[in-house]
Design a protein with these regions (language model features):
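A conserved beta-turn-beta hairpin within the catalytic core of GNAT-like acetyltransferases
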Residues: 64-75, 85, 131-132
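Short acidic/polar active-site loop segments enriched in Thr and Asp
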Residues: 45, 107, 130
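Residue-level recognition of the GNAT/N-acetyltransferase active site
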Residues: 24, 81, 85, 114
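Conserved active-site alpha-helix within GNAT-family acetyltransferase domains
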Residues: 91, 115-133, 138
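Conserved acetyl-CoA-binding loop-helix of GNAT-fold acetyltransferases
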Residues: 80, 86-99, 126
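Conserved beta-strand segments that form the floor/walls of ligand-binding pockets within enzyme
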Residues: 48, 74, 79, 110, ...
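Acetyl-CoA-dependent GNAT
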Residues: 3-70, 139
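Conserved GNAT acetyl-CoA-binding A-motif
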Residues: 94, 101-113
Length: 142
């Protein structure tokens, strides 16, 4: 039976490097750790779905406040292990974080999906998300 576990410490999150590398193959333990050092103080956490010691899915999340939305939960770096896709893992994480946002009295859940990731767009729309705008990016470094 799978377990849902919230991770809040750097040590716990560093153990998730193999599944993070499915999103970011070039990440080393050092790169990942340095980023976590900057993210965790800003309320970054991770939710993992684990079964028999194997992480089947991971969803990073933050709870914050913005002028346009008020209090919100942002899903970030969501990945289902390539061996466990299309088995409901993404739905389990999304439903858990939806309830967490309700419990935390958030006004909404926000996330970004790449414009080329049509599978993710369909998945989130099937879970009640609607496209609200564009997330523009201007790269400043190569």
């Amino acid at each position: 039976m799978s377990q849902l576990i919230e991770l809040g410490t750097k040590a716990e999150m560093l153990e998730q490097l193999p599944i993070i590398q499915q999103l970011y193959p070039d990440y080393t333990l050092e790169i990942y750790g340095n980023l976590l050092d900057k993210m965790i103080p800003h309320n970054y956490k991770q939710l993992v779905v684990v079964e028999n010691g194997i992480t089947m899915g991971l969803a990073g999340f933050w709870i914050g406040t913005k002028l346009w939305s008020g209090k919100y939960l942002e899903m970030d770096n969501v990945v289902v292990h390539e061996d466990f896709r299309s088995k409901g893992i993404g739905s389990i994480m999304t439903e858990y974080l939806n309830q967490k946002a309700i419990d935390e009295n958030c006004n909404m859940i926000a996330l970004d999906a790449y414009t080329t990731n049509f599978g993710a767009q369909k998945f989130y729309m099937n879970h009640g998300f609607v496209p609200k705008g564009f997330h523009f990016v201007k790269y400043l470094k190569d």
